Amino acid sequence: MPSVRSIAWALGGIAAATGLARLAREIFAVDEQPLATAGHVESAGATEATKTFAAAGSTPDQVGIPFAVTRAAAVEPHAEGREFYPRLLEDIAAASSSVHSLMFGWKPGTVGAAVSKVLLDRLADGVEVRVLVDSFGSRPYGSSKQMYTELADGGADIVVNDLLPPDRRGRYPDGVARWPMSTIGRSDHRKLYVIDGHTMWTGGAGIEDHFENGEFHDVMVRLQGDVVRQAQSAFLTSFAAQGGPLSDDLDAYFPEPADGGAIECRIGQVVPGGHISATHAARELIDGASDRLDIMNPYLTDADVISRIAAAAGRGVRVRVVVSERSNNFRASAALKHHYRRLLDAGVEIWEYPGAVVHAKVIIADDRVQFGTLNLDA
């Protein structure tokens, strides 16, 4: 009878097995009508899309820009914070024009202090630093306020994705907080860095100590090539939609890469307001797998996704699912274990990662891979 197994190898083993021959679903991926943007399709597309978005005074609900397939020249997966944080800090320290960070969770601590210090150093040398953080994940009005105040005092432009309207700190005279449900709870879970317009980082990790000290197991990926222009557009449109200032010369943010690359990839967005094309892309990957399907995700609870995983195993695909032996979310863990018998009976291999909390979000389907910040929850 099939059973749940314990696993003791790192994500790097899975990533290396793909060879990253085709990065067909980079970060999130999209559906809808794709915009011909950076790279071999239309080199000026990302710049023009950003200008159009900014000129229209678009809102956060409109930042789900669909991008076309483009190319990457270099794709470097890094597992564990002790590996990816030093490399990320090197890239930031080498920045000569701009550092842009879109971050769900950025809190004080050893890692937070290290990132803040290098950003303050860059600011002192005249490098532009722009930051978009989530109010729930980063606590900029609470425990993290001093850190963000220091960055702002150093010259950083910081805007916040608020889960509540601007009147969050007070109530109206009649004592009723008029917070429409349509504007509450729209957390921005993305994690993205764009450095000098030619290097980007994305993945599941925030700027928090538990990613560095071994408590959480995660992966970040460094990319260069044409795809970075799409990432830059994603950041700038989100930053502007939240009220961040944009310069008149946006062209400077989209330099022509020395090597556009040959690895097919595409950026999509999962943004507050209902743009969930990443989930659609994940389903397409699962449904399209013909030989192997490897999934590592911390909160695998979506019933539809689970049905698709079971169906893949049923049609002869070797399916391996890696989850936490010890999750940081007992409700999500209980919900997944409720489906264990169904998955096992379908032929799915379930591997429980011991010790650290699995926080990486990776799907490998044959020779295609999706990575980034997408949780496969309901």
Where are these regions (language model features)?
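Charged, low-complexity intrinsically disordered terminal segments
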Residues: 5-378
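N-terminal Lys/Arg-rich, disordered targeting/topogenic segments
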Residues: 1-3
